[in-house]
Amino acid sequence: WIMGHMVNKKYQVDEFANLGANAIEFDVTFDPNSKADYTYHKVPCDCGRTCGKYEVFTEFLSYVRNKTTPGHPSFREKLILLQLDLKMSGFSDSESNEAGKDVAKKLLNYYWNRGSNGGRAYILLSIPSIDNQLFLKGFKLQLETEGYSEYLEKVGVDFSANEDLNSILNVLGRLEEEHVWQSDGITDCLARRSTRLRDAIKKRDTGDDRYGIKKVYTWTVDYYPSIRYYLRLGIDGVMTNFPNRVEYILNEEEFSGSLRMATIDDNPWEKYVG
């Protein structure tokens, strides 16, 4: 999975897809009432990127719906996963819960179009902390209440704050969440040890819990040697500002026989057995 980082403007969807991304990550901010409002990343952000670009969240969802709906003139066949980086730092339990309900409603109305020719991409909810776990409860409850629980098959979760992995897995078990991605990373401006990432990969490969880790990705990785290093560790995804670099490396002799880009036929909620 080649995950284009900080794709917060409409024009950037095509820009990153043209560079080879089959997934895009965009930020989601909330107003004081826990309502999702913009695709916005404040200063600071990654080195070499311009912070502060944004769209209205619902308008962006409608735009990417068209990009991921077969038959639409602007359909991008290879774009198969949307990651929502949910900006909920400091939210209380009730605020997290309300935010989950609101995001579910907006996905239902503006992306899935309530079942009428909606987008087909998988959705990855990137929740900042296990302290925000009630977001997921609110999200699921809203879809179930409105009679659209079938969309939960398209949705997975990632806790992104580099917290203790065992604590995360305990929360996932309590939430009975099976569609689990686990991230580890830091801004491209800084270096980070791979100890926790290696542990996540080990838990993915050795765990047999239905609520365990299915995919592991790292962020944000932009340099050729670093991309190769992480691929050798056995990650499933790379979040990057330069998708073309990851695509180039996947075609190198070392990787071309064992790795390929994911397609819509690859289930992101299952472990990959190469």
Swiss-Prot record:
Keywords: Cytolysis, Dermonecrotic toxin, Disulfide bond, Glycoprotein, Hemolysis, Lipid degradation, Lipid metabolism, Lyase, Magnesium, Metal-binding, Secreted, Toxin. One of its GO terms (molecular function) is phosphoric diester hydrolase activity. Disulfide bonds join 45-51, 47-189. Dermonecrotic toxins cleave the phosphodiester linkage between the phosphate and headgroup of certain phospholipids (sphingolipid and lysolipid substrates), forming an alcohol (often choline) and a cyclic phosphate. This toxin acts on sphingomyelin (SM). It may also act on ceramide phosphoethanolamine (CPE), lysophosphatidylcholine (LPC) and lysophosphatidylethanolamine (LPE), but not on lysophosphatidylserine (LPS), and lysophosphatidylglycerol (LPG). It acts by transphosphatidylation, releasing exclusively cyclic phosphate products as second products. Belongs to the arthropod phospholipase D family. Class II subfamily. GO terms for biological process: killing of cells of another organism; lipid catabolic process. Binds 1 Mg(2+) ion per subunit. Glycans are attached at residue 66. Its cofactor is Mg(2+). It comes from Loxosceles spinulosa (Recluse spider). The active site is at 5, 41 (nucleophile). It catalyses: an N-(acyl)-sphingosylphosphocholine = an N-(acyl)-sphingosyl-1,3-cyclic phosphate + choline; an N-(acyl)-sphingosylphosphoethanolamine = an N-(acyl)-sphingosyl-1,3-cyclic phosphate + ethanolamine; a 1-acyl-sn-glycero-3-phosphocholine = a 1-acyl-sn-glycero-2,3-cyclic phosphate + choline; a 1-acyl-sn-glycero-3-phosphoethanolamine = a 1-acyl-sn-glycero-2,3-cyclic phosphate + ethanolamine. This is Dermonecrotic toxin LspiSicTox-betaIII1 G. The name 'Dermonecrotic toxin LspiSicTox-betaIII1' has been assigned by Binford et al., 2009 to AC C0JB92 and AC C0JB94, both derived from Loxosceles spinulosa specimens collected in Namibia (Grootfontein) and South Africa (Borakalalo), respectively. To distinguish between these proteins in UniProtKB, the letters G (for Grootfontein) and B (for Borakalalo) have been appended to their names. Gene3D superfamilies: Phosphatidylinositol (PI) phosphodiesterase.
